[in-house]
Amino acid sequence: MSTNENANLPAARLNRFKNKGKDSTEMRRRRIEVNVELRKAKKDEQMLKRRNVSSFPDDATSPLQENRNNQGTVNWSVEDIVKGINSNNLESQLQATQAARKLLSREKQPPIDNIIRAGLIPKFVSFLGKTDCSPIQFESAWALTNIASGTSEQTKAVVDGGAIPAFISLLASPHAHISEQAVWALGNIAGDGSAFRDLVIKHGAIDPLLALLAVPDLSTLACGYLRNLTWTLSNLCRNKNPAPPLDAVEQILPTLVRLLHHNDPEVLADSCWAISYLTDGPNERIEMVVKKGVVPQLVKLLGATELPIVTPALRAIGNIVTGTDEQTQKVIDAGALAVFPSLLTNPKTNIQKEATWTMSNITAGRQDQIQQVVNHGLVPFLVGVLSKADFKTQKEAAWAITNYTSGGTVEQIVYLVHCGIIEPLMNLLSAKDTKIIQVILDAISNIFQAAEKLGETEKLSIMIEECGGLDKIEALQRHENESVYKASLNLIEKYFSVEEEEDQNVVPETTSEGFAFQVQDGAPGTFNF
């Protein structure tokens, strides 16, 4: 990038670029940057909160003998429920609580607000402590879980009712189905956001939750129970501003690493989501995870056949390579690049986009890391993405290419041109996205600088002209954005200007593979552009 070109670019944007000698971290793009469109699905694929609408197998065998009074609890009104709960008769309270639970477990429009307005939450919370009557503990826990699965306002009503410490006490219940319901409820509360997550942690939920997983063999736990525990732990790792407390993360990580080696697909998916949340932050947070040695297992899961596992594993790997060159190297050393041909051609648009975003942060690394990208044959895949992927993915590819041309050697840039980057790069200049036009103009400028070192700018100009690129660059001189029109003007004046002294005899020698560019200093060999 030439000095006068630099002058045209907003400082904030320049800071994201690495010129030779600039720290590569400036080029890495995290999800939190404001002026780069977030490379994120509209919503995380992982559920924030979950409602329990299933019938528990324990119902039939619980001391409740539900079938005995099934008819009695099906069509209760909220008024009937209030009456039953406010009675001093335990049997009536139990029936009323069960009726409330059934209403709240309705698939369509459960009357959560009516139940809250009726003032039933404090009653349900008090029932959680009735150790002498496990059925009412279970029914009230289930009812509260479903209230907490609603809006933030509804979750707040459960928290304000004092449910957090009551649920934490229930984690140690001798009845597995009650303990599991408490796990689920705490997951819903923590999933609401940072404030409630930290409240759950502050009330001391982590120790008893981890104690439930402290068994020699995880496969001795019931599958649903283990899935619920993993999901709740992942919600304790979730959300930013602020991120979870560091000591909590340190405490949870060893168990997460263990879960990451389990064989159940849902447990693996939620463990990967947890790791993806923990790596979505500054380098110190990434380091906490990387030093636990999880990268090889994440890379293994990156090659899984199940999309629900691949999605968060890729997100976690993508987050790790936003870190330092050393953290990125851990990902490369674990063999991640071998999985990228399939990720970059994945039929799921979102996987392609995240994989390309990840590549853009790897090409922002050192020259030996760019060389690994070359050695793994990934450049043709990036050219393919730039040529024909969904537009959001093409944008990520443009970043990947610009980062590559900013930090790569002349040889690496020549190889990029040889792989056919010029035409798809030029085609994207017609996009209506100013940011991406700026990124592409930077790439073109970087490629020209490499050509200058070889005395090959004329031949590069011809290539650009032949694929219609010159017309596009000329049109950008009338662009409304100042840095776009100045950068395009700069390219035209420097490399396409008629006033420039021209040697009419310079025509690129055509080979079967395209234009052959001679190295100016007489170095052996020909660079095929």
Swiss-Prot record:
Gene3D superfamilies: Importin-alpha, importin-beta-binding domain (1.20.5.690), Leucine-rich Repeat Variant (1.25.10.10)
Cross-referenced SMART domains: ARM (SM00185)
GO cellular component, one term: NLS-dependent protein nuclear import complex
Tissues in which the UniProt entry reports expression: Slightly detected in brain but not in cerebellum and skeletal muscle, highly expressed in testis and spleen.
Highest rank taxon of the organism: Eukaryota
InterPro entries in the record: ARM-like, ARM-type_fold, Arm_3, Armadillo, Importin-a_IBB, Importin-a_IBB_sf, Importin_alpha
Entry note about domains: Consists of an N-terminal hydrophilic region, a hydrophobic central region composed of 10 repeats, and a short hydrophilic C-terminus. The N-terminal hydrophilic region contains the importin beta binding domain (IBB domain), which is sufficient for binding importin beta and essential for nuclear protein import. The IBB domain is thought to act as an intrasteric autoregulatory sequence by interacting with the internal autoinhibitory NLS. Binding of KPNB1 probably overlaps the internal NLS and contributes to a high affinity for cytoplasmic NLS-containing cargo substrates. After dissociation of the importin/substrate complex in the nucleus the internal autohibitory NLS contributes to a low affinity for nuclear NLS-containing proteins.
Protein name as it appears in the record: Importin subunit alpha-1
Organism: Mus musculus (Mouse)
